[in-house]
Structures are given as C-alpha cells and as structure tokens.
C-alpha cells in the first residue's frame, strides 16, 4: 500500500474492484460455458457464477452435492477447464490485493517487487510444487489408482491448491 494520501487509497480500491470483477467475471464465463450444456442455461450460469466467486474468495463452497452426497468437484476430477479455472481463481484470490497491485505497478519485474510480494509468490510456488509432488507420492497407490497421467497430475495439483480453502476437492479422500 505504502501511501499516505487518500487519492492513493482510492486508486487502489478501484483497482481491487476492477480486478475482482475481471477475475470473477472471467471465471464465471468459463465455468458457465462448461456447466450450461450439463445443467441448462439458468442452473449452469448460476453454478458458474457461484463457483467462480467461491473459488476466488477461497470459500470452498460448492453446489455439487446434488450429484451425490459430499461429492464436491469429484465428477470433474479430469476436467482441465473446471479444475484449472477454479485452481487459478483460488491462487489469484489467495495471493491478495497488495500483491496484485505490486504486480500491476511493477509490470512483472521481480527485482522491483515489494519483499511481501516476493515472499508470497515464492512461497505459493514452493507450496504448490511441493504439495503436488507429496500428494502424488503419498496417494499414487491409493486414490490415484485407475487415473491416467493427466488426471493424476490434475488431482494432485488441485489437492495442493485447495488446502487454503474451506472444502473443494476433486478426489474422494475418504476412500
């Protein structure tokens, strides 16, 4: 933030609102396009909007319980569009507004980022890579059995992304 003037805070607030609208809106469109063929126009659009906001806000709430109890996103375990979009929204929403502002203002020049931004980006990358690898190593002979390589990677990556949320999952960890 590093601003002593109200004008700087107003500009930051505008960027936060615009950024949130862009990220959640884009996610809602992508997810809606995926859900509409399966659930129809109204329900598919609602699911797209709801899951986009839930993922971006790191809430982890889903509406998929109608497919089977506690299913979350298990029926989309191998769906790169759904899982990729939700993962991206979780990560972008999770890194925070100050990091976004720094990325925006410094134009992707890592050397000039705030220490906070550097720590958040490096820690996020390490946790995602480490979590993906560890999940694979621990579950390759359990819940990942029967999945192809692409599905295994997607399941492991999503399982590394979602611990920062309240409850999305794409594999049944209960067995």
Regions flagged by a language model, labelled:
Residues 1-175:
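Membrane-proximal intracellular helices of multi-pass ion channels
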